[in-house]
C-alpha cells in the first residue's frame, strides 16, 4: 500500500518586537487527525534563553492546504505549559473572561491605498 506523507506545518509568532511568522513542518506517514503539542528551540526566536530554550507549540486552529498538507496555527507556551509572554492569545482569553457576560465583538481591519489605475500600492 502506497501511503502519502502527511505534512503538518506548525505556524507561530516569534518573540521579536515586531513579530515574524515562524514555521516548522512535521512529516508523518500515519496520522490520527489530531495535532499534538510540539516543541521548538525558543532561543532562535527570542522566546527563551539558550540555557533553557525549550518552548511548546500549542495548536489552536488548523486549515487544510491540500489533501495531505495542513497549516496549524499555534500559540507559544513555556516548557512548563504556561503561556509565554509573547502569547497574545492568552492575554485576549484573560480579557474575554473578564467580560464574559457582555455582548461584544471585535475584528481585524486592513487598509489599502489605491493608485489612479486602481491597483493597490505595495
Language-model region placement:
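Glycine-rich, acidic/polar active-site loops that bind/position phosphate-bearing ligands
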Residues: 1-122
Amino acid at each position: 500500500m502506497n501511503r502519502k506523507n502527511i505534512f503538518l506545518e506548525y505556524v507561530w509568532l516569534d518573540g521579536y518586537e515586531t513579530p515574524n511568522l515562524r514555521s516548522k513542518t512535521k512529516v508523518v506517514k500515519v496520522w490520527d487527525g489530531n495535532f499534538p503539542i510540539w516543541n521548538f528551540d525558543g532561543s532562535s526566536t527570542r522566546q527563551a534563553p539558550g540555557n533553557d530554550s525549550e518552548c511548546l507549540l500549542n495548536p489552536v486552529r488548523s486549515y487544510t492546504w491540500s489533501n495531505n498538507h495542513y497549516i496549524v496555527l499555534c500559540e507559544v507556551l513555556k516548557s512548563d505549559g504556561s503561556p509565554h509572554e509573547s502569547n497574545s492569545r492568552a492575554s485576549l482569553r484573560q480579557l474575554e473572561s473578564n467580560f464574559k457576560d457582555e455582548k461584544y465583538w471585535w475584528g481585524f481591519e486592513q487598509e489599502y491605498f489605491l493608485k489612479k489605475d486602481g491597483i493597490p500600492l505595495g
